[in-house]
UniProtKB/Swiss-Prot annotation:
Pfam families: Anticodon_2, tRNA-synt_1c. Keywords: Aminoacyl-tRNA synthetase, ATP-binding, Cytoplasm, Ligase, Nucleotide-binding, Protein biosynthesis. One of its GO terms (biological process) is glutamyl-tRNA aminoacylation. Catalyzes the attachment of glutamate to tRNA(Glu) in a two-step reaction: glutamate is first activated by ATP to form Glu-AMP and then transferred to the acceptor end of tRNA(Glu). It comes from the Bacteria. This is Glutamate--tRNA ligase. One of its GO terms (cellular component) is cytosol. One of its GO terms (molecular function) is ATP binding. InterPro entries: aa-tRNA-synth_I_cd-bd, aa-tRNA-synth_I_codon-bd_sub2, aa-tRNA-synth_I_CS, aa_tRNA-synth_I_cd-bd_sf, Glu-tRNA-ligase_bac/mito, Glu/Gln-tRNA-synth, Glu/Gln-tRNA-synth_Ib_cat-dom, GluQ/Sye. Monomer.
């Protein structure tokens, strides 16, 4: 069998990590089996589709390096195909036109609920000649002739055997009154035409599965293998919302997460391989198995994701991390030519940072000069008593020929001894003068990275601030 999976998001909002986990599982399964992975945009619902969302979906997949072998396909480009199949089904008594008014359907629903029955269409137009309507009513939908007896049985790769009674299913609308085909129909024709062998998707689609299988059987098409993944819950144990902007996958990029951390976190969010926590992409492909996906819901844990991101910031090749950091610096409009190499910045901040955004926010003083000391830190440390030590340090720094962290450190220690004081009394005013903050990496290394000329200028600036 030639394995083929698909990721088929609807462009009705930002794709969140639940969607991406489904894409990852489908991608991993295809890659492990030597099959193909397809990207399809299910945009048949014209009223709910958002144009910009498609770009976000593609950008998110590319950022995560979840490459596809076919696509992206768009359902809106396939309407003629859907309509030709619907016409065929009507001609062969697999589907029929339904002229029932909204008033009749609402009355039917109300009565069924009142009588304690499950609301569903009663097949009224299925058993009536449409000739009596065609001349007086132009608006109609098309419904699929669902089997009225028997059961639908399928083996879910995660949940085992699932059975539905056909009596519980009504005749599904496959084309709306406006002429547009419905989701449950389009997805069946797409999977049939694109020869999808394995459908990995969220558990919210379980109830769609028997309807889709019945359509496939009517068309005498192969039935794919299904695997329905449990939902992801937020910290309040509520289902993730697709329209919650903070959960959009690209928001995680904006917040400073590496794609490797996202993928590692998501693969473990419902799947396991022993006690192993850290997985390379190659290991994910090697070990991935649908049977090891849990049936239970997973809970989003930001602290775990931050822990993984910290791990990857510190363990991935430094040039690779620097390439991602460069993107964040560009987003902040920071000229990276105006300061140390990004690899040096990573060496300084990686151990203490859980996101790339933290690194950016903490390293600004290496690239952007500041001219105001109006914060509490400056008032606490840049006092008249600091002027003389700062002048002493400035003179020593200006005479350095070989600008190295070791020589800088020796001058700081010399200054401490010269003024017979503590390292904090010298180091903190110097740190604030050079960085504008009371928190930085090791002072001598920080000073070295800032650069000699900039250090001298900032000490002069601090002395002027204290003197005014």
């Amino acid at each position: 069998m030639n394995i083929k999976t698909r990721f088929a998001p609807s462009p009705t909002g930002s794709i969140h990590i639940g969607n991406i986990r489904t894409a990852l599982y489908s991608w991993l399964f295809a890659r492990k089996q030597g099959g193909k992975f397809l990207l399809r945009i299910e945009d048949s619902d014209l009223q709910r589709s958002i144009d910009d969302t498609v770009e976000l979906i593609v950008a998110g997949m590319r950022w995560l390096s979840l490459d596809w072998d076919e696509g992206p396909y768009f359902q809106t480009n396939r309407f003629s195909r859907y309509n030709s199949i619907i016409s065929y089904m009507i001609q062969h008594d697999m589907a029929y036109k339904c002229y029932c008014s909204s008033e009749r359907l609402e009355s039917l629903r109300s009565n069924q609920i009142k009588n304690g029955e499950k609301p569903k269409y009663d097949g009224y137009c299925r058993f009536k000649s449409t000739d009596i309507y065609s001349s007086s009513i132009s608006s109609y939908v098309v419904r699929f002739c669902n089997p009225q007896d028997g059961v639908v049985i399928f083996h879910d790769q995660i949940r085992g055997t699932i059975t539905f009674n056909n009596k519980e299913l009504d005749d599904l609308i496959i084309r709306r009154a406006d002429g547009s085909p419905t989701y449950n129909f389009c997805v069946v024709i797409d999977d049939m035409d694109m020869q999808i062998t394995h459908i990995i998707r969220g558990e919210e689609h379980i109830n769609n599965t028997p309807r889709q299988i019945n359509i496939l059987k009517a068309l005498r098409a192969p039935i794919p293998t299904y695997a329905h993944v449990s939902m992801i819950l937020d910290n309040n144990l509520k289902k993730l919302s697709k329209r919650c902007g903070t959960l959009g996958i690209m928001q995680y990029r904006n917040d400073g997460f590496l794609p490797e951390a996202i993928l590692n976190y998501l693969v473990r969010l419902g799947w396991s391989h022993g006690d192993q926590e850290i997985f390379s992409i190659e290991e994910m492909i090697k070990y991935f198995d649908l049977s090891r996906i849990s049936k239970s819901p997973s809970i989003l844990n930001l602290e775990k994701l931050l822990w993984l991101n910290h791990y990857y910031i510190n363990h991935l090749p430094i040039d690779y991390v620097a390439s991602h950091l460069s993107w964040h610096m560009h987003q902040q409009k920071i000229n990276i030519q105006n300061g140390p190499k990004l690899t040096d910045i990573i060496k300084l901040f990686a151990r203490r940072s859980r996101t790339l955004k933290e690194i950016v926010n903490n390293c600004l003083y290496f690239y952007i000069d500041f001219d105001l000391f109006d914060n509490k830190v400056a008032k606490d440390y840049l006092k008249p008593v600091a002027i003389t030590p700062l002048k002493f340090l400035r003179k020593k720094f200006s005479n350095i020929v070989d600008w190295t962290p070791e020589i800088i450190k020796s001058i700081i220690i010399e200054t401490v001894n010269e003024f017979n004081t503590s390292i904090d009394k010298i180091g903190m005013p110097l740190r604030v003068a050079l960085t504008g903050t009371n928190c930085s990496p090791t002072l001598s290394i920080t000073i070295h990275a800032i650069g000699q000329s900039r250090v001298l200028e900032r000490i002069d600036q601090a002395i002027r601030y204290i003197s005014t």
